[in-house]
């Protein structure tokens, strides 16, 4: 971590390839994915390929996600502190889609001796990932935590993430949209 001015943390909602996160030193906190009573850690105990396979074969138990706990974030922040990191830029899934940012913010407040700035990406998927990648590059350039946070927020406001789904069924089942909207 000595070649960076701050560390970057994000969540698995960023859909960052593990190799890219590792190359840039980005720490990824996994969301939980539930299929019925089974719980998996996104990208850790359930790969993207296995997730999509289960979507097609496990129609009776549609998946839903849950945010990481503040404790999950505290573990990551603590491991960074033990590695000598004093500043963290933590960029997360839109607060309108998940409580992930809230968990990260609660954990950040508990970390004495560290300056942790949490940022609401206001996005999902690779939109978050692009912000995290940009932040990691700013850290490598030696930019300050405050400069990077401001630049990430300005960049966020210029991004527009668009996605399409084959069916609205899963969004409706998990309460992301109303049943009437799915008809």
Predicted regions and their residues:
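N-terminal glycine-rich anion-binding loop in soluble enzyme alpha/beta folds
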Residues: 7-72
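Hydrophobic residues in alpha-helical segments
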Residues: 55-56, 81, 139, 172
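N-terminal glycine-rich phosphate/adenylate-binding segment common to multiple enzyme folds
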Residues: 72-104, 108
């Amino acid at each position: 971590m000595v070649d960076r001015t701050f560390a970057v943390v994000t969540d698995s909602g960023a859909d960052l390839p593990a190799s890219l996160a590792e190359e840039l030193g980005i720490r990824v906190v996994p969301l939980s994915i539930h299929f019925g009573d089974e719980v998996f850690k996104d990208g850790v105990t359930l790969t993207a390929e296995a997730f999509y396979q289960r979507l097609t074969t496990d129609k009776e138990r549609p998946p839903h996600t849950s945010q990481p706990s503040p404790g999950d974030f505290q573990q990551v922040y603590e491991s960074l502190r033990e590695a000598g990191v004093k500043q963290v830029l933590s960029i997360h899934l839109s607060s309108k889609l998940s409580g992930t940012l809230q968990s990260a913010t609660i954990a950040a407040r508990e970390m004495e001796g560290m300056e942790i700035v949490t940022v609401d990406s206001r996005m999902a998927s690779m939109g978050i990932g692009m912000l995290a990648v940009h932040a990691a590059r700013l850290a490598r350039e030696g930019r300050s935590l405050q400069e990077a946070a401001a630049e990430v927020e300005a960049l966020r406001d210029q991004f527009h993430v668009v996605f399409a789904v084959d069916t609205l069924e899963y969004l409706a089942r998990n309460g992301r949209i109303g049943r009437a909207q799915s008809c």
